[in-house]
Amino acid sequence: MARLNINPTRMEMTRLKKLLKTATRGHKLLKDKLDELMKQFLEIVRENKRLREEAENALDTAYKNFIIARAVMSQEYLGSALMMPKQSVSVDVSTRNIMSVDVPVFDFKTENNQSDIYPYGLAFTSGELDSAMEAFSDAMQPLLRLAESEKSAQLLAQEIEKTRRRVNALENVMIPNYIETIKYIAMKLEENERASTTRLMKVKDMVLKKALEEKKKNDLVV
């Protein structure tokens, strides 16, 4: 806490009181924003955990089935089966606003029938490969949601840190400095007022003393 280097005048004190009022109001608004950001961030983190588990389970199932398929199928047939993908996908990217933070929204679309996920005929492939392809397809949506969630959490964390720095600056530096300076100016003004009153009383005493002396002289002459 440090006092601002300004002239201790009533005008400056009035100006500082206005700044203090603005800073206090800004601190409350930023504190409310920080609380809401933290709430949104924690909700995204919880959703992130759920999506990660969902994606990991789907991928785990896909990998296990793929390993079995690779064991029971020849490498030639397996490579041929996966060489030409039959279904095409696209991802549209947009944004949504959370407390003045633009976070991404990923929209996953398939251009063919969702059920048409097998890029091969069924004559020379195993059921495990079908299960693996289905599991990989099922994992796409939670993986995309997971990427969206993690990026949103990252952006909110950055905004939280920036807002927290501003709250701390107001709370620990600016507002205390304004208060300290206002107290200092009030003290100096009070000192000046006391000094001015003392001077006036001294002048009054001198005037009275001089008047009494003049009266005594006049009385002696009479």
UniProtKB/Swiss-Prot annotation:
Keywords: ATP synthesis, Hydrogen ion transport, Ion transport, Transport. It holds the Pfam family ATP-synt_D. One of its GO terms (molecular function) is proton-transporting ATPase activity, rotational mechanism. InterPro entries: V_ATPase_D. One of its GO terms (biological process) is proton motive force-driven plasma membrane ATP synthesis. Belongs to the V-ATPase D subunit family. Produces ATP from ADP in the presence of a proton gradient across the membrane. This is V-type ATP synthase subunit D. It comes from Clostridioides difficile (strain 630) (Peptoclostridium difficile). The lineage of its organism: Bacteria, Bacillati, Bacillota, Clostridia, Peptostreptococcales. The gene is atpD.
